[in-house]
Every structure is written in C-alpha cells, then in structure tokens.
C-alpha cells in the first residue's frame, strides 16, 4: 500500500485528520456490522471519498429518504454531490458544532443511526458532543483509533479505564466489533483502528444524575490519575460524606466503578440542593 496522501485525485488533509478507507473486504464487513435497511434515518460523519457512503446508500437510501452526511471539506462536498445526487443529503460544516437533533424524526422516539470513520484528532471531543443527542439516537457505529476504543470499553481496575470510559459507559452500552489494520487506509495511519458499536441506554435505564455534575466529579478524579482519590477529590470532602457512602478514598480513579461515581455525584447534587 502506497504512503501517498493522494487518493482518487484528492489529497488527504492532515488538518482534517483524513485517512481514506480503501479495503473493500473491510468496507463490506463494516457495512454488514452496521446492518443498514431501507428507509432508516442514517447520518454519516465525514464521508470522505464515499467508501462507506456508496454501500450505505445502496442498502437504505431513496430520494425521499436519503442518507445524510456531515462533511467539513468543501472540495469533497462537491464531488459527493455530483456522485450521489438526491440519494445523499449533505450538510456542510463541522461535526463538533453540528446539531444532530435537527435530523431526527418528530417525536420523542429515538430515530437516528449515526456512523462514520471519525477523524482521530477530534474523536474524544466529538464523542462527548454526540452524547448530548443520545436520546435521539438508536445506535452509533464508528471507526476510531484502537486505543480509544479500548478506553471506551475498559473495565475498572485496568490502565485503560479513564474519564472517557466512565462518561460513555454511563450513557451507552458499547462493544468493540472489528479490528482494522493501517493498510486498509490511504494514506495508512500510524495506529491500529477498530469499529465500536454504541447503543444509548433508554431513559428508564439511566440513573437519575446530572451528567454535568458527574463530568465535573470524574474530571477531578482523573486529573492526577496516579494519585489517591483522597487527593484528587479532597475539595469535596467537606460536602460529601464519603464514609457514609462506603466510598473508599484510598484508591485511584481507575479503580472506581461507573455506578460508584454516579452514587457520589447524586450525593453531591443532594448536598448542593440542600444548601440552596
């Protein structure tokens, strides 16, 4: 596989984190994993040169119910419009600022399926942005750096368990689906990749906790991950009765389960409300 940054006459742009998928066997496996069906409301983030776009459109799109795609590179937008016409509705812009809820069906029922080969340089911020639309989403399938996927699905007590693990596991059921080697791309990235499936919990399955408050607490806990929680969560000791919660501060952030973090965030919310 050539290391050239040019593919199909387009130069991959480093600032957009572009690595184009070119292995047709891998593409077929990804599409099979996604399982698109006619009439579904699907959004592709970063369609690039259309490697996934084409088989997705073949499986689900009609002029009345097109595949939606969010693309930042205006050079690619023109090519995609010309190639796919009314079967692809393109939204020019940055996925980090895009309102995905605007593409959902009317009503409260989740309707969006979101897919994409996400730019690795913005993957974590984009995953957090997408969390704000989780109630409108049926599922998500993303190509990501393998290291990021391993962190997403990591168990407590492992080195890979992180702030990303806690926040995403609170909101989604996640599963690593496929490994994708560098030679599947043009130009080949310097890292291994993987496909992850993310299914949001339904409202009745979610714990009653403020996600902003949970994020505040988890960020503090992991701010110095080699230190004990008595240090990183020290500012909360006057507010929260950790002993009463049975929460051991003589641990590191990676040793605490998602449920325990949720419990502490709930206790913090109750104390702050009582102090109002």
UniProtKB/Swiss-Prot annotation:
Q: What is its main location?
A: cytoplasm
- Can you say what this protein is called? Ribosomal RNA small subunit methyltransferase A
Q: Which family does it belong to?
A: Belongs to the class I-like SAM-binding methyltransferase superfamily. rRNA adenine N(6)-methyltransferase family. RsmA subfamily.
Native organism? Burkholderia ambifaria (strain ATCC BAA-244 / DSM 16087 / CCUG 44356 / LMG 19182 / AMMD)
- Give the EC number: 2.1.1.182
Main role?
Specifically dimethylates two adjacent adenosines (A1518 and A1519) in the loop of a conserved hairpin near the 3'-end of 16S rRNA in the 30S particle. May play a critical role in biogenesis of 30S subunits.
Q: Where in the cell is it found?
A: Cytoplasm
**PROSITE patterns found in the cross-reference section:** SAM_RNA_A_N6_MT (PS51689)
Q: Which UniProt keywords apply?
A: Cytoplasm, Methyltransferase, RNA-binding, rRNA processing, S-adenosyl-L-methionine, Transferase
Q: GO MF annotations for this entry?
A: 16S rRNA (adenine(1518)-N(6)/adenine(1519)-N(6))-dimethyltransferase activity; RNA binding
Cellular component, GO annotation: cytosol
Listed under catalytic activity are:
adenosine(1518)/adenosine(1519) in 16S rRNA + 4 S-adenosyl-L-methionine = N(6)-dimethyladenosine(1518)/N(6)-dimethyladenosine(1519) in 16S rRNA + 4 S-adenosyl-L-homocysteine + 4 H(+)
């Amino acid at each position: 596989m050539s290391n050239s940054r040019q593919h199909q006459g387009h130069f991959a742009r480093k600032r957009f984190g572009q690595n184009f998928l070119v292995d047709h066997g891998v593409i077929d496996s990804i599409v099979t994993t996604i399982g698109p069906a006619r009439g579904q409301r699907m959004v592709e983030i970063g369609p690039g040169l259309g490697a996934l776009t084409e088989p997705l459109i073949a499986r689900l799109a009609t002029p009345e119910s097109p595949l939606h795609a969010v693309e930042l590179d205006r050079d690619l937008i023109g090519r995609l419009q010309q190639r796919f016409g009314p079967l692809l509705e393109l939204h020019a812009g940055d996925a980090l600022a895009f309102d995905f809820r605007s593409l959902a069906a009317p009503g409260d029922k989740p309707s969006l399926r979101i897919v994409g080969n996400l730019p690795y340089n913005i993957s974590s911020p984009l995953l957090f942005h997408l969390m704000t639309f989780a109630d409108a989403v049926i599922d998500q399938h993303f190509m990501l750096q393998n290291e990021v996927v391993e962190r997403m699905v990591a168990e407590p007590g492992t080195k890979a368990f992180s702030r990303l693990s806690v926040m995403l596991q609170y909101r989604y059921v996640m599963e690593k689906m496929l490994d994708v080697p560098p030679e599947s791309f043009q130009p080949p990235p310097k890292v291994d990749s993987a496909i992850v499936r993310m299914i949001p919990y339904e409202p009745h399955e979610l714990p009653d906790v403020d996600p902003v408050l949970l994020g505040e607490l988890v960020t503090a806990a992991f701010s110095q991950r080699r230190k004990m929680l008595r240090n990183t969560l020290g500012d909360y000791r006057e507010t929260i009765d950790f002993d009463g919660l049975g929460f051991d501060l003589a641990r590191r952030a990676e040793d605490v389960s998602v449920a325990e973090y949720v419990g502490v965030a709930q206790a913090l919310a109750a104390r702050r409300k009582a102090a109002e």
